[in-house]
Amino acid sequence: MIKSRTAIKRLSPAHTSAKGGGILQAFLKKYPWSILAAGAAIQILTGVPSAWGVFQKAVCETYELAEADAAMIFSFVICFFGIGCILGGLLQDKAGPRAAGLSGAVLLGGGFCMAGWLVPAGIPWAFYLAFSVPVGLGCAFLYPSVMSCAQKWYAEKKGLATGVIGGAVGLSGAVLTWLGRFLIARVGIRGAFLWLGALMFAVCAAACALLENPQGKAAAAAAQGAAQNYTVGQMLKTKQYWLLFFVVALATPAVLLFSPIIVELAQQRGLSEAAALSCIVVGSAASAAGRLLMPWLSDKIGRRYTDMLLFAALAGLSIWFAFAQGWLVIAVYSLLTFCYSGEAAVIPAAVTDLFGQKNAGVNYGFAALGMSLGSVGFPLAARFLGLEAGRHWLAVGAAAAGLVCLVFLKPTQGKRL
C-alpha cells in the first residue's frame, strides 16, 4: 500500500510539475543566458511598429484604405500596446511570465492571420479590430513578460538584460522589413500576413517555454533591488509616476509620427524607393544600438541623466529633421530612432528602480499608458495643426517638455535614479 501511494504521488500532476520546474530552474541557473536568448528570439519578431512602413503601401492598395486610415492602424497598435502592458503585467504577476507570454503569442499570431484572412477591403475599423487590437495586446503581453523575467535573473545587471532584449526589439524592424518585402513580392500582403502570423506564433510560443521566474537565491537577489516594492495604488499616488508617465508620452512624436510614412517622406525629399526603404533598415539598426547601449550607459550614470541627454538630442534632431533632404533624411531619422529607442529601453529599469521589482510587470504597464496617450493624441493633434509642419513642431515641443519633466523627476527612496 505504501509503495502504491508513493507511485501515485510520483505520477501526480503537482509532483511532475514541481519536478519539471526543478529541472528548468537548474538549467536556467546554470545557463542564465538562455533567458536572454529566448527573450531575444521573441522580441526580434515583435517590432511591428518599426516595420510598419514596409506594409503601409500594400495595405492601402489591397485593403482600399486612405493613407491616414492606414497610419491609424499603426497608432492603434501602439495604443493597445500600452493598455496591454497593464493586462499582461497583471497576468504575469498572477500566473507567471510563461502564461502571459503564451497568451501574447496567440494574440500576435492571431492578429496577423485575421488581417490576412478575414478583413474585407474598404473598412478601416475592421482592420483596427482584427489587427491593431490583438497585435498591440500580443506585443504588450510578450514585452514585459520577457523584460521582467530577464531583469529578475540579472538583478544586479538590469541594464545588460534590458539592453539585450531591447536590442532584439530594435533589430526586429529590419528583420520584419526583409520578411515583409520577401513575402509581399511572392504571395501579396494577405499571404504575407498569414505566413508572418504563423511564424510569430511558432517562434514565440516555443521560446516562452523557457520563461520562468527565479527561485531560491536568485529570487532573493532579485528582491533586493529596492527598499520598498510599490503596489499600483501606491505608485499612482506618487509624483514620480505621473512625471514618468508624461516622459513616456512626450517621447512618442519624435519617431512614431514619422514611422508609418517614412518611406513616402524620404521619396518626397529626393530619395529613390529603394533608398527610401533603407530608412527602415538603417533606422532599425540604430534602434537596436540605442536599446543595447543606453541601458548600459544608464547603469553607469543613472537612468535620469541618460534620458535627459536623449530628450535634449531628440529636440535638436527633430528641428534638423524638419529641413533634412536626400540622404540626410536617413541619417537624421536613424539618429532619432537611436535616441527614442534608447530612451524607451531605459524606462523598464527606471520603473524598477523607482517602484521595486515585485510588481514591476504591472507597474511598467501603467507607465506604458503614456505611450497609448501619445500614439493616438499626437497624430490627432498633427492632423489639426496640418500634417506636414504639425508633425515636426509637435516632436520638437514634446521633446523639450519631456526634458523638463525629467529635471523634476527625483528618486522615491533616497537612491540615485
Which residues does each PLM region occupy?
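Extracytoplasmic gate region of multi-pass secondary transporters
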Residues: W52-V59, K239-A289, M294
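Hydrophobic core of transmembrane alpha-helices in multi-pass small-molecule transporters
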Residues: P124-A140, A249, L328-S341
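Flexible cytoplasmic inter-helical loops of multi-pass small-molecule transporters
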Residues: N213-Y230, L417
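Helix-to-loop junctions at the C-terminal end of transmembrane segments
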Residues: G84-P97, R291-G302
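C-terminal transmembrane helical hairpin of 12-TM major facilitator-type secondary transporters
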Residues: V281-S287, L292-L293, S298-A350
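Intracellular juxtamembrane helix-capping segments at the cytosolic ends
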Residues: F141-Y154, A161-T162, G342-F355
